[in-house]
Amino acid sequence: MYALKRELWCVLLLCGAICTSPSQETHRRLRRGVRSYRVTCRDEKTQMIYQQHQSWLRPLLRGNRVEHCWCNDGQTQCHSVPVKSCSEPRCFNGGTCLQAIYFSDFVCQCPVGFIGRQCEIDARATCYEDQGITYRGTWSTTESGAECVNWNTSGLASMPYNGRRPDAVKLGLGNHNYCRNPDKDSKPWCYIFKAEKYSPDFCSTPACTKEKEECYTGKGLDYRGTRSLTMSGAFCLPWNSLVLMGKIYTAWNSNAQTLGLGKHNYCRNPDGDTQPWCHVLKDHKLTWEYCDLPQCVTCGLRQYKEPQFRIKGGLYADITSHPWQAAIFVKNRRSPGERFLCGGILISSCWVLSAAHCFQERFPPHHVRVVLGRTYRLVPGEEEQAFEVEKYIVHKEFDDDTYDNDIALLQLKSDSLTCAQESDAVRTVCLPEANLQLPDWTECELSGYGKHEASSPFYSERLKEAHVRLYPSSRCTSKHLFNKTITNNMLCAGDTRSGGDNANLHDACQGDSGGPLVCMKGNHMTLVGVISWGLGCGQKDVPGVYTKVTNYLNWIRDNTRP
Protein backbone atom coordinates (compact mmCIF):
# COMPACT_ATOMS: atom_id res chain seq x y z
CA MET A 1 0.00 0.00 0.00
CA TYR A 2 2.84 2.40 0.90
CA ALA A 3 4.55 1.63 -2.41
CA LEU A 4 1.33 2.50 -4.27
CA LYS A 5 1.05 5.81 -2.44
CA ARG A 6 4.68 6.51 -3.12
CA GLU A 7 4.23 5.81 -6.85
CA LEU A 8 1.13 8.03 -7.02
CA TRP A 9 2.99 10.81 -5.19
CA CYS A 10 5.84 10.70 -7.70
CA VAL A 11 3.41 10.84 -10.64
CA LEU A 12 1.85 13.98 -9.21
CA LEU A 13 5.26 15.60 -9.11
CA LEU A 14 6.38 14.74 -12.64
CA CYS A 15 5.98 18.33 -13.89
CA GLY A 16 9.50 19.53 -13.23
CA ALA A 17 9.68 17.70 -9.89
CA ILE A 18 12.49 15.48 -8.73
CA CYS A 19 11.82 12.52 -6.40
CA THR A 20 14.55 11.79 -3.91
CA SER A 21 14.71 8.28 -2.53
CA PRO A 22 14.36 8.13 1.24
CA SER A 23 17.79 6.87 2.22
CA GLN A 24 18.09 8.78 5.46
CA GLU A 25 18.41 7.05 8.79
CA THR A 26 15.39 6.96 11.11
CA HIS A 27 16.04 8.09 14.67
CA ARG A 28 13.66 6.88 17.35
CA ARG A 29 13.99 7.71 21.03
CA LEU A 30 11.69 6.58 23.83
CA ARG A 31 10.99 9.54 26.05
CA ARG A 32 10.98 8.33 29.64
CA GLY A 33 7.59 8.42 31.34
CA VAL A 34 5.73 8.64 28.01
CA ARG A 35 4.33 5.63 26.18
CA SER A 36 5.12 6.91 22.72
CA TYR A 37 8.10 7.12 20.40
CA ARG A 38 9.49 10.44 19.13
CA VAL A 39 10.08 9.97 15.43
CA THR A 40 12.67 12.30 13.87
CA CYS A 41 14.56 12.56 10.61
CA ARG A 42 18.15 13.56 10.04
CA ASP A 43 18.87 15.25 6.74
CA GLU A 44 22.09 13.52 5.73
CA LYS A 45 23.07 16.41 3.46
CA THR A 46 22.78 19.13 6.11
CA GLN A 47 22.98 16.98 9.30
CA MET A 48 19.97 18.80 10.73
CA ILE A 49 17.29 17.02 12.75
CA TYR A 50 13.58 17.46 12.00
CA GLN A 51 10.43 16.32 13.80
CA GLN A 52 7.65 14.19 12.34
CA HIS A 53 5.72 16.09 9.60
CA GLN A 54 8.15 19.03 9.76
CA SER A 55 9.12 20.46 6.35
CA TRP A 56 12.12 22.45 5.15
CA LEU A 57 14.01 23.60 2.09
CA ARG A 58 17.57 22.55 1.46
CA PRO A 59 20.13 24.28 -0.76
CA LEU A 60 20.47 21.76 -3.56
CA LEU A 61 20.31 24.23 -6.41
CA ARG A 62 19.28 23.06 -9.85
CA GLY A 63 18.89 26.18 -11.94
CA ASN A 64 16.32 28.25 -10.13
CA ARG A 65 14.94 25.37 -8.05
CA VAL A 66 15.67 23.87 -4.63
CA GLU A 67 14.38 20.82 -2.79
CA HIS A 68 11.40 20.91 -0.44
CA CYS A 69 11.65 18.09 2.12
CA TRP A 70 9.51 16.78 4.95
CA CYS A 71 9.80 14.16 7.66
CA ASN A 72 7.37 11.27 7.22
CA ASP A 73 7.56 8.26 9.55
CA GLY A 74 11.27 8.75 10.07
CA GLN A 75 12.08 9.08 6.38
CA THR A 76 13.05 12.24 4.51
CA GLN A 77 11.06 12.78 1.33
CA CYS A 78 11.96 15.59 -1.07
CA HIS A 79 10.90 17.15 -4.34
CA SER A 80 12.10 20.22 -6.20
CA VAL A 81 10.22 23.51 -6.09
CA PRO A 82 10.71 26.85 -7.87
CA VAL A 83 12.14 29.73 -5.83
CA LYS A 84 12.68 33.48 -6.05
CA SER A 85 14.90 35.98 -4.25
CA CYS A 86 13.76 36.70 -0.70
CA SER A 87 11.83 39.91 -0.11
CA GLU A 88 14.08 40.68 2.87
CA PRO A 89 17.58 39.54 3.93
CA ARG A 90 17.64 36.51 6.21
CA CYS A 91 21.10 35.06 5.60
CA PHE A 92 24.30 35.96 7.45
CA ASN A 93 27.89 36.21 6.23
CA GLY A 94 26.99 37.13 2.66
CA GLY A 95 24.60 34.21 2.05
CA THR A 96 22.05 34.43 -0.79
CA CYS A 97 18.44 34.08 0.35
CA LEU A 98 15.95 32.17 -1.83
CA GLN A 99 12.27 31.85 -1.00
CA ALA A 100 9.76 29.31 -2.30
CA ILE A 101 7.29 30.91 -4.71
CA TYR A 102 4.18 29.16 -3.41
CA PHE A 103 4.86 29.15 0.36
CA SER A 104 6.93 31.06 2.91
CA ASP A 105 9.88 28.70 3.49
CA PHE A 106 13.33 30.05 2.58
CA VAL A 107 16.81 28.63 2.12
CA CYS A 108 20.24 30.25 2.24
CA GLN A 109 22.92 29.56 -0.35
CA CYS A 110 26.04 30.00 1.77
CA PRO A 111 29.43 31.26 0.61
CA VAL A 112 32.42 28.94 0.91
CA GLY A 113 33.28 28.29 4.56
CA PHE A 114 29.82 28.91 6.03
CA ILE A 115 26.98 26.49 6.72
CA GLY A 116 23.73 26.40 8.68
CA ARG A 117 20.14 27.36 7.90
CA GLN A 118 21.12 31.06 7.79
CA CYS A 119 24.86 30.65 7.02
CA GLU A 120 25.48 31.47 10.67
CA ILE A 121 28.04 28.70 11.25
CA ASP A 122 31.69 29.30 10.40
CA ALA A 123 33.01 25.91 9.29
CA ARG A 124 36.55 27.34 9.10
CA ALA A 125 36.78 28.26 12.80
CA THR A 126 39.23 25.86 14.45
CA CYS A 127 39.57 27.54 17.85
CA TYR A 128 37.81 30.01 20.13
CA GLU A 129 38.94 33.43 21.35
CA ASP A 130 38.62 34.74 24.91
CA GLN A 131 35.62 32.94 26.48
CA GLY A 132 34.33 31.69 23.15
CA ILE A 133 31.14 33.77 23.31
CA THR A 134 31.44 34.55 19.59
CA TYR A 135 32.63 31.06 18.60
CA ARG A 136 30.51 29.77 15.69
CA GLY A 137 32.58 26.77 14.60
CA THR A 138 31.68 23.08 14.29
CA TRP A 139 33.44 21.43 17.25
CA SER A 140 31.03 18.97 18.91
CA THR A 141 33.04 16.87 21.38
CA THR A 142 33.30 17.50 25.13
CA GLU A 143 36.25 17.16 27.49
CA SER A 144 34.82 13.82 28.67
CA GLY A 145 34.84 12.57 25.08
CA ALA A 146 31.05 12.61 24.72
CA GLU A 147 29.30 13.83 21.59
CA CYS A 148 27.20 16.97 21.99
CA VAL A 149 23.41 16.74 21.73
CA ASN A 150 21.62 18.77 19.05
CA TRP A 151 20.40 22.05 20.58
CA ASN A 152 16.99 21.41 18.98
CA THR A 153 16.52 18.07 20.73
CA SER A 154 13.08 17.96 22.37
CA GLY A 155 14.62 16.80 25.64
CA LEU A 156 16.27 20.22 26.01
CA ALA A 157 12.96 22.11 25.84
CA SER A 158 12.99 22.69 29.60
CA MET A 159 16.65 23.68 29.68
CA PRO A 160 17.53 27.40 29.86
CA TYR A 161 19.48 27.23 26.59
CA ASN A 162 18.14 25.42 23.55
CA GLY A 163 17.77 25.95 19.81
CA ARG A 164 14.13 27.04 20.08
CA ARG A 165 14.73 30.19 22.11
CA PRO A 166 13.64 33.45 20.40
CA ASP A 167 17.26 34.65 20.54
CA ALA A 168 18.77 31.31 19.50
CA VAL A 169 20.45 32.61 16.34
CA LYS A 170 22.02 35.51 18.23
CA LEU A 171 23.42 33.06 20.80
CA GLY A 172 24.70 30.70 18.11
CA LEU A 173 22.16 27.98 18.96
CA GLY A 174 20.02 26.14 16.44
CA ASN A 175 19.52 22.86 14.64
CA HIS A 176 23.04 21.55 15.25
CA ASN A 177 25.16 20.05 18.02
CA TYR A 178 28.13 22.40 17.94
CA CYS A 179 29.78 23.81 21.07
CA ARG A 180 28.68 27.29 22.12
CA ASN A 181 28.87 29.64 25.11
CA PRO A 182 25.43 31.30 25.29
CA ASP A 183 25.61 32.11 29.02
CA LYS A 184 29.07 33.69 28.99
CA ASP A 185 30.68 30.84 30.91
CA SER A 186 34.46 30.41 30.95
CA LYS A 187 34.56 28.49 27.64
CA PRO A 188 32.27 26.80 25.05
CA TRP A 189 30.09 23.93 26.23
CA CYS A 190 27.12 21.81 25.19
CA TYR A 191 24.59 19.38 26.60
CA ILE A 192 25.31 15.65 26.61
CA PHE A 193 23.04 12.70 27.34
CA LYS A 194 24.57 10.69 30.17
CA ALA A 195 23.13 8.49 32.92
CA GLU A 196 19.64 8.85 31.47
CA LYS A 197 19.65 12.65 31.69
CA TYR A 198 20.82 15.77 29.88
CA SER A 199 23.63 17.74 31.52
CA PRO A 200 26.06 20.47 30.42
CA ASP A 201 29.69 19.64 29.75
CA PHE A 202 32.63 21.81 28.72
CA CYS A 203 33.89 21.19 25.21
CA SER A 204 37.40 20.19 24.21
CA THR A 205 37.47 22.98 21.63
CA PRO A 206 41.04 24.38 21.48
CA ALA A 207 41.58 27.99 22.50
CA CYS A 208 43.24 30.26 19.95
CA THR A 209 46.83 31.06 20.81
CA LYS A 210 47.28 34.71 21.69
CA GLU A 211 50.30 36.57 20.49
CA LYS A 212 51.77 38.72 23.22
CA GLU A 213 50.87 42.28 22.31
CA GLU A 214 53.93 44.51 22.62
CA CYS A 215 52.19 47.63 23.82
CA TYR A 216 51.23 49.23 27.12
CA THR A 217 47.96 50.44 28.58
CA GLY A 218 47.53 53.52 30.74
CA LYS A 219 50.99 54.44 32.01
CA GLY A 220 52.35 50.95 31.46
CA LEU A 221 52.59 50.11 35.16
CA ASP A 222 51.54 46.54 34.41
CA TYR A 223 53.61 46.11 31.25
CA ARG A 224 55.50 42.81 31.42
CA GLY A 225 56.58 42.44 27.80
CA THR A 226 60.07 41.98 26.38
CA ARG A 227 60.71 45.25 24.53
CA SER A 228 64.22 46.52 25.38
CA LEU A 229 64.86 49.37 22.95
CA THR A 230 64.52 53.09 23.70
CA MET A 231 63.17 55.87 21.49
CA SER A 232 66.71 56.86 20.50
CA GLY A 233 67.51 53.30 19.49
CA ALA A 234 69.67 52.51 22.53
CA PHE A 235 69.54 49.10 24.21
CA CYS A 236 68.33 48.96 27.80
CA LEU A 237 70.72 47.95 30.56
CA PRO A 238 69.79 44.88 32.61
CA TRP A 239 68.07 45.85 35.86
CA ASN A 240 70.71 43.77 37.69
CA SER A 241 73.66 45.50 36.01
CA LEU A 242 76.43 46.46 38.44
CA VAL A 243 76.42 49.89 36.79
CA LEU A 244 73.08 50.54 38.53
CA MET A 245 74.40 50.03 42.06
CA GLY A 246 73.07 52.89 44.15
CA LYS A 247 70.00 53.48 41.96
CA ILE A 248 66.54 53.06 43.49
CA TYR A 249 64.91 50.97 40.80
CA THR A 250 67.03 47.89 40.21
CA ALA A 251 66.75 44.12 40.54
CA TRP A 252 67.87 44.52 44.19
CA ASN A 253 64.88 46.69 45.14
CA SER A 254 62.84 45.03 47.91
CA ASN A 255 59.75 45.22 45.65
CA ALA A 256 61.60 44.17 42.49
CA GLN A 257 59.37 41.20 41.73
CA THR A 258 56.18 43.25 42.14
CA LEU A 259 57.62 46.03 39.96
CA GLY A 260 58.62 43.59 37.22
CA LEU A 261 62.37 44.12 37.69
CA GLY A 262 64.90 41.28 37.60
CA LYS A 263 67.71 39.66 35.64
CA HIS A 264 66.58 41.14 32.33
CA ASN A 265 66.71 44.42 30.38
CA TYR A 266 63.01 44.77 29.51
CA CYS A 267 61.23 48.11 29.64
CA ARG A 268 59.30 48.80 32.84
CA ASN A 269 57.63 51.67 34.70
CA PRO A 270 58.40 51.03 38.38
CA ASP A 271 58.08 54.66 39.53
CA GLY A 272 54.71 55.61 38.01
CA ASP A 273 56.17 57.73 35.20
CA THR A 274 54.08 58.53 32.12
CA GLN A 275 55.22 55.38 30.26
CA PRO A 276 57.75 52.49 30.43
CA TRP A 277 61.46 53.37 30.49
CA CYS A 278 64.86 51.86 31.25
CA HIS A 279 68.45 52.74 32.14
CA VAL A 280 70.92 53.24 29.28
CA LEU A 281 74.53 54.22 28.76
CA LYS A 282 74.98 57.29 26.57
CA ASP A 283 78.50 58.55 25.84
CA HIS A 284 79.72 56.35 28.71
CA LYS A 285 77.31 58.12 31.08
CA LEU A 286 74.46 56.44 32.92
CA THR A 287 71.04 57.93 32.15
CA TRP A 288 67.50 56.76 31.33
CA GLU A 289 65.15 57.01 28.36
CA TYR A 290 61.55 56.24 27.50
CA CYS A 291 61.12 53.04 25.55
CA ASP A 292 60.13 52.70 21.92
CA LEU A 293 56.86 51.04 22.84
CA PRO A 294 53.42 51.90 21.45
CA GLN A 295 50.36 52.42 23.59
CA CYS A 296 47.76 49.69 23.13
CA VAL A 297 44.77 50.60 21.01
CA THR A 298 41.81 50.81 23.39
CA CYS A 299 39.37 52.63 21.13
CA GLY A 300 36.15 50.76 20.49
CA LEU A 301 36.55 48.44 23.49
CA ARG A 302 33.73 48.19 26.00
CA GLN A 303 32.25 46.30 28.93
CA TYR A 304 29.07 45.26 27.15
CA LYS A 305 26.03 44.61 29.32
CA GLU A 306 23.19 42.62 27.81
CA PRO A 307 20.10 44.88 27.65
CA GLN A 308 17.37 43.76 30.06
CA PHE A 309 14.45 45.88 28.87
CA ARG A 310 13.02 46.12 25.36
CA ILE A 311 11.26 49.38 24.53
CA LYS A 312 9.76 50.91 21.41
CA GLY A 313 12.46 51.37 18.82
CA GLY A 314 15.24 49.53 20.63
CA LEU A 315 16.58 48.47 24.01
CA TYR A 316 17.55 50.30 27.19
CA ALA A 317 21.34 50.27 27.50
CA ASP A 318 24.10 51.09 29.97
CA ILE A 319 26.75 53.67 29.12
CA THR A 320 29.49 51.04 29.55
CA SER A 321 28.09 49.35 26.45
CA HIS A 322 28.52 52.60 24.47
CA PRO A 323 31.25 54.56 26.32
CA TRP A 324 31.88 56.84 23.30
CA GLN A 325 28.32 58.20 23.48
CA ALA A 326 28.16 61.90 24.36
CA ALA A 327 25.17 64.00 25.42
CA ILE A 328 25.27 67.60 24.16
CA PHE A 329 23.38 70.31 26.06
CA VAL A 330 22.84 74.00 25.26
CA LYS A 331 21.84 76.89 27.52
CA ASN A 332 18.29 78.18 27.17
CA ARG A 333 18.13 81.65 25.60
CA ARG A 334 15.25 83.13 27.56
CA SER A 335 15.16 81.06 30.73
CA PRO A 336 17.67 79.66 33.20
CA GLY A 337 19.06 76.17 32.78
CA GLU A 338 19.91 74.12 29.75
CA ARG A 339 18.22 71.68 27.39
CA PHE A 340 19.31 68.49 25.71
CA LEU A 341 20.38 69.18 22.13
CA CYS A 342 21.86 66.14 20.38
CA GLY A 343 24.06 63.11 20.68
CA GLY A 344 27.78 63.07 20.01
CA ILE A 345 30.70 60.65 19.63
CA LEU A 346 34.02 60.80 21.47
CA ILE A 347 36.76 60.26 18.86
CA SER A 348 39.76 61.49 20.88
CA SER A 349 40.45 62.86 24.33
CA CYS A 350 39.43 66.42 23.39
CA TRP A 351 37.23 66.00 20.31
CA VAL A 352 33.60 64.97 19.85
CA LEU A 353 31.94 64.30 16.50
CA SER A 354 28.28 65.20 15.90
CA ALA A 355 25.81 66.25 13.20
CA ALA A 356 26.00 69.68 11.56
CA HIS A 357 22.22 70.19 11.62
CA CYS A 358 22.32 70.23 15.44
CA PHE A 359 24.10 73.61 15.29
CA GLN A 360 22.00 75.46 12.74
CA GLU A 361 21.10 78.06 15.38
CA ARG A 362 24.80 78.98 15.70
CA PHE A 363 24.94 78.86 19.49
CA PRO A 364 27.89 80.62 21.15
CA PRO A 365 30.43 77.88 22.03
CA HIS A 366 30.37 78.84 25.73
CA HIS A 367 26.64 78.02 25.79
CA VAL A 368 27.32 74.40 24.77
CA ARG A 369 28.22 71.63 27.23
CA VAL A 370 29.24 68.03 26.56
CA VAL A 371 28.63 65.23 29.06
CA LEU A 372 30.33 61.82 28.80
CA GLY A 373 29.69 58.66 30.81
CA ARG A 374 25.98 59.18 31.48
CA THR A 375 23.40 56.36 31.31
CA TYR A 376 20.41 58.56 32.20
CA ARG A 377 19.99 61.66 30.05
CA LEU A 378 19.29 64.12 32.89
CA VAL A 379 20.71 62.26 35.90
CA PRO A 380 24.43 62.68 36.65
CA GLY A 381 26.35 59.39 36.60
CA GLU A 382 29.03 58.23 39.02
CA GLU A 383 31.70 58.16 36.32
CA GLU A 384 30.50 61.02 34.14
CA GLN A 385 32.79 63.76 32.86
CA ALA A 386 31.43 67.15 31.78
CA PHE A 387 33.18 69.75 29.61
CA GLU A 388 32.60 73.21 28.29
CA VAL A 389 33.25 73.65 24.57
CA GLU A 390 36.25 75.61 23.27
CA LYS A 391 34.80 75.77 19.75
CA TYR A 392 32.74 73.78 17.31
CA ILE A 393 33.28 73.36 13.58
CA VAL A 394 30.40 72.81 11.19
CA HIS A 395 31.32 71.44 7.76
CA LYS A 396 31.48 74.41 5.37
CA GLU A 397 29.52 72.58 2.70
CA PHE A 398 26.68 71.42 4.93
CA ASP A 399 23.39 71.68 3.02
CA ASP A 400 20.50 72.35 5.40
CA ASP A 401 18.02 71.26 2.73
CA THR A 402 19.43 67.85 1.75
CA TYR A 403 21.57 67.34 4.90
CA ASP A 404 24.58 66.60 2.70
CA ASN A 405 27.88 66.89 4.67
CA ASP A 406 25.93 66.62 7.93
CA ILE A 407 28.95 66.52 10.23
CA ALA A 408 30.46 68.74 12.94
CA LEU A 409 33.34 68.69 15.43
CA LEU A 410 33.37 69.98 19.01
CA GLN A 411 36.62 70.73 20.83
CA LEU A 412 36.38 70.18 24.57
CA LYS A 413 37.86 72.84 26.85
CA SER A 414 40.69 71.81 29.15
CA ASP A 415 43.60 73.39 31.00
CA SER A 416 45.89 70.53 29.94
CA LEU A 417 46.66 68.61 26.76
CA THR A 418 44.11 65.95 27.69
CA CYS A 419 40.40 66.23 28.35
CA ALA A 420 38.38 63.03 28.73
CA GLN A 421 39.96 60.41 30.99
CA GLU A 422 39.48 56.82 29.85
CA SER A 423 37.28 54.57 32.01
CA ASP A 424 34.68 51.85 31.56
CA ALA A 425 32.08 54.60 31.05
CA VAL A 426 34.19 56.91 28.86
CA ARG A 427 36.24 55.71 25.91
CA THR A 428 36.88 56.74 22.32
CA VAL A 429 35.38 54.90 19.38
CA CYS A 430 37.69 53.71 16.59
CA LEU A 431 37.64 55.73 13.39
CA PRO A 432 37.45 53.55 10.27
CA GLU A 433 40.21 53.02 7.77
CA ALA A 434 39.68 55.00 4.57
CA ASN A 435 39.15 51.83 2.52
CA LEU A 436 36.75 50.14 4.94
CA GLN A 437 34.20 48.04 3.04
CA LEU A 438 31.72 46.09 5.16
CA PRO A 439 29.48 43.45 3.54
CA ASP A 440 25.90 44.40 2.74
CA TRP A 441 23.48 43.66 5.60
CA THR A 442 26.25 43.71 8.23
CA GLU A 443 24.60 44.06 11.64
CA CYS A 444 25.65 47.25 13.45
CA GLU A 445 24.52 49.27 16.46
CA LEU A 446 23.38 52.81 17.12
CA SER A 447 22.80 54.52 20.45
CA GLY A 448 21.25 57.72 21.75
CA TYR A 449 18.83 59.46 24.10
CA GLY A 450 16.22 60.18 21.40
CA LYS A 451 12.48 59.57 21.34
CA HIS A 452 10.98 56.09 21.43
CA GLU A 453 8.76 56.94 18.44
CA ALA A 454 8.14 59.92 16.18
CA SER A 455 4.84 60.85 17.86
CA SER A 456 6.33 60.99 21.36
CA PRO A 457 6.65 64.50 22.87
CA PHE A 458 9.59 63.47 25.06
CA TYR A 459 13.13 62.23 24.65
CA SER A 460 14.14 58.98 26.33
CA GLU A 461 15.17 59.32 29.96
CA ARG A 462 17.73 56.56 29.50
CA LEU A 463 20.31 55.67 26.87
CA LYS A 464 18.99 53.29 24.22
CA GLU A 465 20.64 51.03 21.70
CA ALA A 466 19.27 49.65 18.45
CA HIS A 467 20.49 46.93 16.10
CA VAL A 468 20.30 47.63 12.39
CA ARG A 469 21.86 46.32 9.18
CA LEU A 470 23.78 48.20 6.52
CA TYR A 471 21.77 48.51 3.32
CA PRO A 472 23.46 47.93 -0.05
CA SER A 473 23.94 51.09 -2.08
CA SER A 474 21.31 49.83 -4.55
CA ARG A 475 18.71 50.07 -1.76
CA CYS A 476 19.95 53.45 -0.47
CA THR A 477 18.56 55.67 -3.22
CA SER A 478 16.00 58.43 -3.65
CA LYS A 479 13.63 55.85 -5.11
CA HIS A 480 13.60 53.94 -1.81
CA LEU A 481 13.25 57.10 0.32
CA PHE A 482 10.27 58.83 -1.28
CA ASN A 483 12.44 60.83 -3.72
CA LYS A 484 14.50 62.50 -0.97
CA THR A 485 18.02 63.40 -2.08
CA ILE A 486 20.65 60.78 -1.32
CA THR A 487 24.31 61.64 -1.94
CA ASN A 488 27.54 59.65 -1.90
CA ASN A 489 28.22 61.12 1.56
CA MET A 490 25.32 59.17 3.03
CA LEU A 491 24.67 55.53 3.89
CA CYS A 492 21.51 53.69 4.92
CA ALA A 493 20.83 51.21 7.72
CA GLY A 494 17.67 49.73 9.14
CA ASP A 495 16.01 46.86 10.96
CA THR A 496 15.30 44.15 8.38
CA ARG A 497 13.39 41.72 10.59
CA SER A 498 10.08 40.49 9.26
CA GLY A 499 6.89 41.69 10.91
CA GLY A 500 3.78 43.74 10.39
CA ASP A 501 3.37 47.50 10.63
CA ASN A 502 3.16 47.25 14.41
CA ALA A 503 6.39 45.31 14.79
CA ASN A 504 8.91 46.84 17.17
CA LEU A 505 11.54 47.67 14.58
CA HIS A 506 14.81 49.21 15.75
CA ASP A 507 15.72 52.65 14.42
CA ALA A 508 17.09 56.06 15.34
CA CYS A 509 14.59 58.81 16.11
CA GLN A 510 14.44 62.53 16.92
CA GLY A 511 17.08 63.38 19.52
CA ASP A 512 19.48 60.66 18.42
CA SER A 513 21.04 62.97 15.79
CA GLY A 514 24.80 63.26 16.02
CA GLY A 515 25.12 59.89 17.71
CA PRO A 516 27.09 56.85 16.52
CA LEU A 517 26.44 54.03 14.10
CA VAL A 518 29.14 51.49 14.96
CA CYS A 519 30.08 48.08 13.59
CA MET A 520 32.43 45.42 14.95
CA LYS A 521 35.81 45.33 13.16
CA GLY A 522 38.20 42.88 14.70
CA ASN A 523 37.40 43.15 18.40
CA HIS A 524 36.83 46.91 18.27
CA MET A 525 33.66 48.89 17.62
CA THR A 526 34.34 51.12 14.63
CA LEU A 527 32.42 54.26 13.70
CA VAL A 528 30.87 54.01 10.23
CA GLY A 529 28.11 56.60 10.43
CA VAL A 530 26.78 59.68 12.25
CA ILE A 531 23.02 59.65 12.83
CA SER A 532 21.63 62.24 10.40
CA TRP A 533 18.02 61.96 9.24
CA GLY A 534 15.13 59.64 8.41
CA LEU A 535 11.47 59.46 7.45
CA GLY A 536 9.60 58.73 10.66
CA CYS A 537 11.03 56.19 13.07
CA GLY A 538 11.04 52.41 12.81
CA GLN A 539 9.01 52.14 9.62
CA LYS A 540 9.21 48.82 7.81
CA ASP A 541 11.49 48.85 4.75
CA VAL A 542 12.40 52.53 5.34
CA PRO A 543 16.05 52.81 6.48
CA GLY A 544 17.61 55.61 8.47
CA VAL A 545 20.22 57.81 6.78
CA TYR A 546 23.70 58.38 8.23
CA THR A 547 26.70 60.53 7.35
CA LYS A 548 29.37 58.25 5.84
CA VAL A 549 32.40 58.76 8.10
CA THR A 550 34.98 57.31 5.68
CA ASN A 551 34.39 60.31 3.41
CA TYR A 552 35.47 62.74 6.14
CA LEU A 553 38.64 61.24 7.61
CA ASN A 554 40.88 63.92 6.06
CA TRP A 555 38.46 66.64 7.19
CA ILE A 556 38.53 65.27 10.74
CA ARG A 557 42.31 64.96 10.71
CA ASP A 558 42.86 68.48 9.34
CA ASN A 559 40.55 70.08 11.90
CA THR A 560 41.78 68.23 14.98
CA ARG A 561 45.50 68.80 14.48
CA PRO A 562 47.10 70.59 17.46
UniProtKB/Swiss-Prot annotation:
Record domain Kringle: where: 126-208, 214-296
Pfam family, any one: fn1
Any one of the GO CC terms: extracellular space
Domain called Fibronectin type-I: residue spans: 39-81
EC number: 3.4.21.68
Segments forming domain EGF-like: 82-120
Domain Peptidase S1: 311-561
Post-translational modifications reported in the UniProt record: The single chain, almost fully active enzyme, can be further processed into a two-chain fully active form by a cleavage after Arg-310 catalyzed by plasmin, tissue kallikrein or factor Xa.
Catalytically driven reaction(s): Specific cleavage of Arg-|-Val bond in plasminogen to form plasmin
Quaternary assembly: Heterodimer of chain A and chain B held by a disulfide bond. Binds to fibrin with high affinity. This interaction leads to an increase in the catalytic efficiency of the enzyme due to an increase in affinity for plasminogen. Similarly, binding to heparin increases the activation of plasminogen. Binds to annexin A2, cytokeratin-8, fibronectin and laminin. Binds to mannose receptor and the low-density lipoprotein receptor-related protein (LRP1); these proteins are involved in TPA clearance. Binds LRP1B; binding is followed by internalization and degradation. Forms heterodimer with SERPINA5.
Record family assignment: Belongs to the peptidase S1 family.
Name of the molecule in the record: Tissue-type plasminogen activator
Organism: Sus scrofa
Organism ancestry: Eukaryota, Metazoa, Chordata, Craniata, Vertebrata
